[in-house]
């Protein structure tokens, strides 16, 4: 058992608070919906980056390489000044949605290099230019560029010329749950000595001011003050009535600059007076402008920075050390010295041991580095998220529980009280949770911290998140938007993970999740199956601009869309709920009724989706699924865009083991009778039941039959259509030469193959589903292929790539797709990483080339990273791909069973993980098309 696993176990079993402190500080609190109190809902311009240094936040804090406690009462982060910038570098800079030619975009270079799941060791790198940061140039140049042009990046400005920058490494090591050692290393990569101001900063989140709602307001204002210390150190005493007393020790007799975390009204709002003589930007004004009156000579406040001023020689480094501890943790009056550095060495060694225990030994050194950085990114992307719907809506005069309210954004979500640590998609570009993203986050998180992954799923199903109607909240810009229903699938995966780790079935977790997911399923059926036909709408369903029309808006034609992806997601939802019901039926036979209910509902969805003729989504001529435009007169038109929408029906595929049928015998018998009475159900999906079982009597629930599976795979595996060098494209390359065009009332609606960024402003313009490669839907395709493989075995083979003459079984196809996805991040034969495209600095400079960014999506033809640069939310799935195919081969998949295919290592390393992807722990079946074995 590794030392880190022991800490995880203590955190779970003994409630030792190893996770109380972590990287829970956002990287952008400004420009968020929570901080928006404008009349028009313009969050980006109501609270800007320029305001952020001077204006206290209401709902959270942000900072550079920062940490906080799990209620974000006390925060620590690093501020920097190079002597040339007009402001301190206290937070990352980026463009707002209207400033960027492809929407909002961070314009900095930073990397999450390492983290253990308890944050006993963490490492972060920020690259800080020595010349003045080109704020104005970045804004002006990007504003001039069209959506058809490349983005203007920080490297393009020339500010890193001659390597005139500092590498700033920030490391944390925990000597105990609330004893945090901090080491900051600044390396001058340039040819000349350069000045650098390092300002490690400690502050309290403002929860005491009069403008904080009374129910969230602290009873007593906390305080920071300078302590008397032995020679050679400086220290700050932090007193908080809830958190307790803490000390920040600073190596060296460095000056301490105190101010208040209060708004500078006089700077921002003409005619308003400051409530305090010392305000949030006081330290900035003291250091940058030399205004010593801006900081408190009484050496106390609610925000403090230790001011280290150094001159770093060319190629040299400087190190500063700090220690943040609760008052009882460090009795030794000399908190630094050799034990300090020894603790860092121990924690790094333990981190190495931990990652070795979860990384397959067959994985290359480069792939292991990618996997570790992906998981570090997942762990660094945790954030404290605070939103009190009742109070927030009161403050906007839009709480429907009160008279005189007016409708506003999220006014129907007044029940919400979110105050938790949540895995973010990207802590700068998307510093708010997204429900369907979060389901995918749990897969890589479960590699390192299954407990935290399970907690994330439980959060979204709590009554203070889940709407009373059963709807899951989407994201703060519009909680009422509709995302794919993937939470039952993630719950099933986490359950199987826990079983594989040797734990007992958590029946309470399964029951709670199942009952809440039933509410969500009912919401879908009641709200998104408009006419009760088992054909679903849903809106944009997370795929932004993939459709001919904006799928969240009324159609220009009138009528409505019958969505192939919405219906496919619901088919998968029924399969997941069926499997969860089987698990529960083993402990409570009442749930066997739910097995029947969800299997039957799947049959009805399959029959509706696979309806023959012009009113069906399946196009027999093309061999593909399309959305149906249902016009007001009842007629239907297929929208023949070859997109991920038409591939998703493939993903509704689940193998059913013999033992699962044995756990629900009455349901199984009843379903066979139902199919006997209604043969049209049997004929509308993959064959099931007697005469259609595979190896070990396994069955298959799938929307597509063998013939349709082959036809879809022909397109999916065609390199001139969906199969790109680096994964499955979101739209077929066919549309590069053959755009889809639809005319309505003299208006042209057009879909082209766009392998890079979007050329429209639809959904903010900062994402694109018309060609690039996206990890989550690729993961669902891989899951489906593995399910089909463990049903068919080696008797079902296809050409891969299409037209190559090379036949592969479906395990080999799944691995081929995974390998292509993983190659985005790996060095090729020329030492270049496709993720960095033509950015030569990242490709050839040894100080850049091994630091990985995990982008939101990837160029459909060359694999270059696009969109958000740190979306080790769902792009962290690459860690799961590396781990999965490092452990799993086709033989093991065929010989194992649904649970035995979850890999367990020796008892010495109990933090071993399932070797399967998603919930696919299925074994194979030997099923010959047209000649399967028959079982009674």
Which residues are covered by each model-predicted region?
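Basic, low-complexity intrinsically disordered segments
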Residues: 64
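Active-site-proximal polar cores
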Residues: 68
């Amino acid at each position: 058992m590794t030392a880190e696993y022991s800490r995880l176990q203590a955190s779970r079993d003994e409630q030792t608070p190893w996770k109380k402190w972590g990287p829970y500080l956002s990287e952008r609190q400004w420009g968020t919906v929570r901080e928006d109190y404008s009349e028009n809902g313009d969050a980006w311009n109501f609270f800007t980056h320029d305001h952020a240094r001077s204006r206290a936040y209401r709902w959270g804090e942000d900072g550079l390489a920062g940490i906080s406690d799990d209620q974000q009462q006390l925060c620590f982060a690093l501020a920097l000044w190079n002597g040339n910038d007009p402001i301190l570098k206290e937070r990352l800079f980026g463009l707002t949605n209207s400033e960027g030619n492809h929407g909002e975009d961070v314009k900095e270079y930073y990397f999450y290099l390492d983290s253990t799941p308890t944050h006993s060791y963490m490492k972060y790198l920020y690259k800080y230019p020595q010349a003045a940061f080109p704020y104005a140039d970045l804004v002006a140049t990007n504003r001039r560029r069209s959506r058809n042009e490349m983005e203007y990046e920080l490297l393009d400005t020339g500010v890193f010329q001659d390597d005139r920058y500092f590498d700033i490494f920030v490391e944390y090591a925990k000597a105990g749950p609330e004893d945090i050692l901090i080491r900051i290393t600044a390396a001058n990569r340039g040819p000349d000595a350069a000045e650098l101001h390092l300002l490690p900063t400690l502050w309290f989140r403002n929860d005491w001011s009069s403008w904080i709602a009374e129910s969230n307001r602290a009873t007593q204002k906390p305080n920071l003050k300078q302590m008397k210390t032995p020679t050679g150190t400086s220290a700050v005493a932090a007193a908080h009535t809830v958190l307790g007393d803490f000390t920040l020790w600073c190596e060296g007799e460095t000056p301490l600059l105190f101010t208040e975390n209060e708004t500078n009204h006089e700077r921002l709002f003409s005619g308003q007076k400051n409530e305090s003589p010392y305000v949030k930007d006081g330290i900035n004004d003291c250091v940058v402008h030399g205004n010593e009156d801006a900081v408190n000579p009484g050496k106390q406040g609610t925000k403090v920075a230790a001011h280290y001023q150094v001159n770093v020689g060319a190629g040299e480094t400087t190190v500063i050390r700090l220690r943040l501890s609760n008052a009882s943790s460090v009795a030794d009056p000399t908190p630094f010295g050799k034990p300090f550095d020894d603790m860092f060495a121990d924690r790094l060694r333990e981190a190495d041991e931990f990652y070795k225990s979860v990384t397959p030994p067959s994985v290359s050194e480069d792939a292991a580095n990618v996997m570790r950085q992906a998981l570090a990114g997942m762990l660094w992307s945790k954030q404290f998220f605070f939103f009190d719907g009742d109070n927030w809506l009161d403050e906007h005069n839009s709480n429907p529980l009160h008279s005189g309210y007016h409708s506003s954004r999220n006014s129907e979500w007044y029940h919400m009280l979110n105050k938790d640590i949540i895995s973010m998609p990207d802590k700068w570009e998307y510093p708010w949770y997204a429900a369907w993203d979060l389901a995918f986050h749990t897969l890589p998180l479960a590699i390192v911290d299954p407990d935290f992954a399970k907690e994330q799923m439980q959060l979204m199903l709590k009554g203070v998140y889940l709407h009373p109607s059963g709807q899951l909240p989407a994201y703060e810009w519009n909680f009422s938007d509709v995302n794919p229903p993937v939470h039952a699938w993630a719950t099933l995966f986490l359950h199987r993970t826990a079983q594989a780790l040797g734990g007992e079935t958590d029946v309470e977790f399964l029951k709670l999740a199942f009952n809440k997911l039933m509410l969500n399923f009912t919401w879908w059926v009641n709200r998104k199956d408009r006419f009760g036909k088992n054909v679903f709408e849903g809106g944009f369903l997370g795929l932004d601009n993939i459709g001919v029309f904006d799928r969240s808006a009324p159609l220009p034609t009138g009528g409505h869309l019958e969505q192939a992806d919405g219906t496919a997601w619901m088919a998968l939802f029924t399969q997941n709920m069926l499997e969860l019901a089987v698990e529960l039926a083993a402990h409570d036979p009442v749930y066997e009724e739910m097995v029947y209910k969800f299997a039957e509902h799947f049959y009805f969805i399959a029959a509706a989706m696979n309806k023959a003729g012009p009113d069906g989504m399946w196009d027999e001529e093309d061999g593909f699924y399309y959305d149906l435009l249902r016009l007001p007169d009842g007629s239907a038109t297929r929208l023949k865009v070859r997109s991920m929408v038409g591939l998703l029906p493939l993903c509704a595929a689940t193998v059913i083991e013999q033992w699962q049928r044995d756990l629900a015998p009455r349901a199984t018998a009843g379903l066979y009778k139902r199919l006997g009475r209604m043969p049209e159900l049997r004929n509308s999906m993959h064959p099931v039941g007697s005469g259609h079982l595979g190896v070990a009597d396994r069955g298959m629930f799938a929307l597509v039959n063998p013939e349709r599976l082959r036809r879809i795979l022909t397109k999916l595996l065609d390199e001139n259509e969906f199969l790109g060098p680096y994964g499955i494209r979101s739209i077929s390359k066919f549309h590069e030469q053959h755009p889809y065009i639809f005319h309505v009332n003299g208006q042209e609606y057009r879909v082209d193959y766009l392998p890079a960024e979007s050329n429209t402003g639809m959904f903010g313009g900062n994402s694109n589903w018309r060609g690039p490669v996206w990890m989550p839907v690729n993961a669902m395709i891989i899951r489906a292929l593995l399910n089909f493989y463990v049903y068919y075995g080696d008797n079902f083979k296809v050409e891969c790539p299409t037209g190559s003459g090379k036949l592969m079984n479906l395990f080999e196809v799944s691995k081929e797709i995974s390998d292509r996805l993983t190659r985005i991040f790996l060095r090729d034969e020329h030492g270049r990483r496709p993720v960095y495209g033509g950015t030569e600095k990242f490709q050839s400079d040894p100080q850049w080339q091994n630091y990985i960014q995990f982008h939101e999506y990837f160029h459909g033809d060359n694999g270059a990273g696009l969109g958000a640069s740190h979306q080790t939310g769902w792009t962290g799935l690459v860690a799961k791909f590396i781990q999965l195919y490092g452990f799993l081969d086709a033989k093991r998949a065929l010989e194992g069973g649904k649970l035995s295919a979850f890999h367990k290592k020796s008892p010495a390393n109990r933090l071993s993980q399932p070797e399967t992807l998603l919930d696919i722990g299925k074994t194979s079946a030997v099923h010959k098309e047209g000649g399967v074995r028959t079982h009674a």
